C-alpha cells in the first residue's frame, strides 16, 4: 500500500520552537531531533486537499535514483558565460572565458547527462547555429576553457 508524505512538515516542526506533533508537546528543538519518527519527511493526514504537497513515497525514491546528474537549465535571455560559470561552480569547476564572443539563449533548454555529455551537447547546439565556441575540459584541475578558433 502506498503512503503519502508531506515534505515540509518536518522542516516546519524543527524550525518552530514549541510544537504539537501527533498529540505530543515538544518544548525544545533537541527533543524534536531526538524523536526517531521525525526525519526529513513526516507522515501526516491523507487528503485530496493537500495533493500539491504530497508525494507518493515509491515515486519520490524512484525519481531520486533515476535522475541524471548534472543537469544544466537555460532560459530565454540567459547569457552563456554567466550560466556556464554558475553551473560549473556548482560542480567544483572554474570557467576560463578565452573568447570575445557572447551567446544569449532565445529558448529554454535542459541539458542532461554526465558532465562531459552536457558540455558536448551544449557546444554542438552552439556550433549548429554558426557560433564558433568550443569547450576544453581539464578534469585534474577542474577547469573548463571556453575558446574560439576563428
UniProtKB/Swiss-Prot annotation:
InterPro entries linked to this entry: Pilus_synth_Q_C
Consequence of changing residue 55 to I: In strain: Z17561
Family matches, as Pfam families: TcpQ
Domain of life, per lineage: Bacteria
Functional description taken from the UniProt entry: Involved in TCP pilus biogenesis.
Descriptive protein name: Toxin coregulated pilus biosynthesis protein Q
Organism: Vibrio cholerae serotype O1 (strain ATCC 39315 / El Tor Inaba N16961)
Amino acid at each position: 500500500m502506498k503512503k503519502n508524505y508531506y515534505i515540509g512538515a518536518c522542516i516546519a516542526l524543527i524550525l518552530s520552537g514549541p510544537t504539537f506533533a501527533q498529540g505530543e508537546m515538544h518544548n525544545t528543538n533537541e527533543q524534536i531531533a531526538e524523536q526517531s519518527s521525525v526525519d526529513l519527511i513526516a507522515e501526516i493526514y491523507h487528503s485530496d486537499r493537500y495533493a500539491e504537497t504530497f508525494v507518493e513515497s515509491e515515486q519520490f525514491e524512484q525519481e531520486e535514483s533515476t535522475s541524471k546528474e548534472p543537469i544544466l537549465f537555460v532560459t530565454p535571455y540567459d547569457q552563456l558565460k554567466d550560466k556556464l560559470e554558475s553551473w560549473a561552480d556548482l560542480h567544483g569547476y572554474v570557467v576560463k572565458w578565452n573568447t570575445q564572443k557572447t551567446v544569449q539563449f532565445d529558448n529554454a533548454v535542459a541539458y542532461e547527462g554526465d558532465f562531459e555529455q552536457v558540455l558536448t551537447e551544449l557546444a554542438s547546439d552552439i556550433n549548429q547555429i554558426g557560433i564558433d565556441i568550443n569547450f576544453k575540459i581539464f578534469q585534474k584541475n577542474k577547469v573548463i576553457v571556453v575558446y574560439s578558433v576563428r
